[in-house]
A protein has these predicted regions:
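Alpha-helix capping/hinge segments and adjacent helical runs
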Residues: 363-489
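Generic structural signal for well-ordered, non-transmembrane alpha-helical segments
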Residues: 36, 40, 136-139, 181, ...
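Extended amphipathic alpha-helical segments enriched in small hydrophobics
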Residues: 292-353
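FAD-binding core of flavoproteins
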Residues: 152-296, 463-488
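Glycine-rich flavin
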Residues: 61-196, 203-216, 221, 226
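N-terminal-proximal low-complexity accessory segments that begin disordered
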Residues: 1-48
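Charged/polar positions within long, soluble alpha-helices
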Residues: 150, 316, 342-349, 377-384, ...
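Short, charged, amphipathic alpha-helical segments
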Residues: 324-331, 359-367
Length: 489
C-alpha cells in the first residue's frame, strides 16, 4: 500500500500520541504551530510517490505495491535503483529533513532480510517471525516510524545499572505471559511527535545488563508512551516562507521519549536478553551501521549539491567569483559533492552480495559518512566566509517590499550584479536560514553529532571498521622493509 498525504494526516490526528509542548499536552499535532510544518512535509512525501512513478515498486516480498524505500535489493542493479529513488526524495528536500519516512522503512527492510541468518539464529524462530510480520505490516500500512536509541546522559562515569534508578535508561521491569513491561527514557527521538510507530533500539555498550537488551516496535500512542518535544524552530509569528525558506518547509522536531511502565507484547519484540548479540546486529551479520551511514551519504550528497549551488550563486551575485581565494572555496565545495557521489557509486560497485540482500560496501559508506561529520560544518563555514557581512543587512520581511516608499529605496540600494533587490533578499534569506537561524544551527549540530562524537567515530574507523583490513595495509610497508638491505654484521 502507498498512502496519500491526507491519509497520513488523518491517521496521526486520530492516533493522538501524548506529546508535551510548553507545559501542555498537544491536542492535535497536525495543527500545532510547532509541528504542522513537518506534518505537511511528511504528507508531501507520501503524495510525491503518486506524482513520480519511479518512487513506487511492486514489492515481491509482500505481494503489493510499496514505496521504493521498502525495496530489499538482491543485486547491485536493485541497490542502484534504491539509491536513485532515495536521491530523488532527498533532492526534493535539498538534503534536509533527514528523518523522512523512508529512513526507517529502510531499517525495517534490512531487519526482514536477516530474519533467518541473524534473528532466528540469535533469538529463535518466534523473534524471526516477528521481524517478518512487522515488515509486512509496515509495507501494507505504509506507517511512519520514528526511532530512539540514545540513553540519558545521567552519569557517564557509571553504567546505568549502578545509577540511583537503574530504569533511567530503558529496561525490562518484568516479564508476563503476554509480553514485558518496560520503563525509562531515550533522547533525541527525531520526528516522534508526528510519527505513528516507534522502534526502540538498545544501548548496551555502556552496560551489558540483559534487562537493557531489548529491541521492539510499538505504536506511538501506546499507553505510557510520552514525548517531550523541544522548542519549535518554525518561522517567527508574522513571517513565513519568504523570510524562512528552508525552515518553513524542513523544520524537524526532536523529542525525549518516556516509557512509563509500557506493556510491549511478545510479538512486537525482535531482540531480547542477549546483549552480546548487539555486535552482530551493528557490525557483523546485519551491519545496521553500514545501512544508516549509507543513507546519511545520500542525504548529504543532496545537501552538498544545494550548498555548492548556494555558494556559487552568492559569489556570482556579489561579483567575487573571479577572486582566486573565493574560487578555491567554491572548488572545495564541488570536491565535497564529487567525493560523496563517488562514495555512493563505489559503495554500489563494491557492494556485498549476500544470500538475502545486497549491501552497500561498509568501508566506503561508513568512512564517507564519518568524514561528512566534519565536512558539512566546513561547508557552512565556507558559506559564511564567502557571504561575509552581506548576510546581515537584510530587510525584515516581505512587507518591506509592499511599502511603496521603502520598496523604491530597496530596489535602488540592495540590487547587485545580476540580481534585483527582491532576488538578492531571497538569496540571502536562504543563506541565513541555512547558517544562522535556529533551524540552521540545529541542522549543523545534528550533522556533527547524529552518529555520535566525531572523535570517537573517526577513531572507530581505525579500531573497528577497518579491523579486518589493517593487516592488508601494514603488509605493504613490511614488503618494502623486507626488500631493504640489512647491515653486514
Amino acid at each position: 500500500m502507498i498512502r496519500k498525504g491526507v491519509q497520513y494526516i488523518t491517521s496521526i490526528r486520530e492516533r493522538a500520541p501524548v506529546v508535551y509542548y510548553n507545559g501542555e499536552v498537544v491536542k492535535d499535532v497536525t495543527e500545532h504551530p510547532a509541528f504542522r510544518i513537518p506534518v505537511k512535509t511528511v504528507a508531501k512525501y507520501y503524495d510525491h510517490h503518486w506524482e513520480e512513478e519511479s518512487l513506487r515498486i511492486y514489492n515481491k516480498d509482500v505481494g503489493e505495491e510499496s514505496s521504493i524505500s521498502f525495496l530489499r535489493p538482491r543485486s547491485k542493479a536493485e541497490l542502484k535503483k534504491l539509491r536513485e529513488g532515495l536521491v530523488r526524495i532527498y533532492d526534493s528536500y535539498y538534503g534536509f529533513f533527514g528523518r523522512s519516512p523512508d529512513y526507517m522503512n529502510m531499517w525495517t527492510t534490512v531487519f526482514s532480510a536477516h530474519s533467518e541468518d541473524y534473528f532466528e539464529r540469535a533469538f529463535g524462530r518466534k523473534f524471526a517471525e516477528n521481524v517478518i510480520n512487522i515488515y509486512r505490516e509496515s509495507v501494507k500500512n505504509d506507517f511512519f516510524y520514528t526511532h530512539a536509541i540514545v540513553a540519558p546522559m545521567y552519569d557517564r562515569s557509571r553504567p546505568p545499572s549502578q545509577w540511583e534508578d537503574p530504569f533511567i535508561q530503558i529496561g525490562v521491569v518484568r516479564e508476563t505471559n503476554e509480553g514485558v513491561i518496560v520503563r525509562g527514557a531515550a533522547m533525541i527521538s527525531t520526528a516522534a511527535p508526528y510519527a505513528e510507530m516507534l522502534w526502540y533500539l538498545p544501548n548496551v555498550r555502556r552496560d551489558s545488563d540483559p534487562k537493557y537488551a531489548i529491541f521492539f516496535s510499538i505504536p506511538t500512542n501506546t499507553k505510557g508512551v510520552k514525548f517531550i518535544a523541544r522548542r519549535g524552530f518554525q518561522p517567527r509569528e508574522g513571517f513565513g516562507a519568504f523570510e524562512y525558506p528552508i525552515s518553513s518547509k524542513f523544520e524537524e522536531s526532536d523529542a525525549i521519549l518516556i516509557l512509563d511502565n509500557v506493556f510491549v507484547p511478545w510479538d512486537r519484540i525482535i531482540f531480547y536478553g542477549k546483549p552480546e548479540e548487539i555486535e552482530g546486529f551493528m557490525w557483523h551479520t546485519v551491519r545496521l551501521r553500514t545501512w544508516f551511514n549509507w543513507h546519511f551519504v545520500i542525504q548529504h550528497y543532496s545537501r552538498l549539491k544545494f550548498l555548492a549551488g548556494l555558494a556559487i550563486t552568492i559569489a556570482e551575485a556579489v561579483g567575487i567569483n573571479n577572486f582566486i581565494n573565493v574560487q578555491k572555496k567554491l572548488g572545495e565545495l564541488l570536491i565535497y559533492v564529487s567525493m560523496n557521489e563517488a562514495a555512493l557509486f563505489g559503495a554500489e560497485e563494491a557492494a556485498e552480495e549476500l544470500p538475502n540482500i545486497t549491501r552497500p560496501n561498509s568501508y566506503i559508506s561508513i568512512s564517507m559518512s564519518h568524514f561528512n561529520m566534519k565536512l558539512l560544518p566546513r561547508a557552512n563555514e565556507i558559506l559564511k566566509s564567502i557571504s561575509g557581512g552581506s548576510s546581515i543587512p537584510i530587510p525584515s520581511g516581505l512587507r518591506d517590499f509592499e511599502n511603496p516608499e521603502e520598496k523604491g529605496l530597496l530596489e535602488k540600494y540592495l540590487a547587485s550584479k545580476g540580481l534585483n533587490a527582491i532576488e538578492r533578499v531571497k538569496l540571502f534569506n536562504i543563506l541565513w536560514d541555512v547558517i544562522g537561524s535556529e533551524s540552521g544551527v540545529r541542522y549543523e549540530q545534528y550533522d556533527r553529532f547524529s552518529r555520535g562524537d566525531p572523535t570517537i567515530r573517526w577513531a572507530q574507523t581505525y579500531y573497528e571498521v577497518f579491523k579486518e583490513r589493517k593487516a592488508e595495509f601494514t603488509k605493504l610497508v613490511k614488503q618494502v622493509m623486507d626488500q631493504m638491505p640489512n647491515p653486514r654484521v
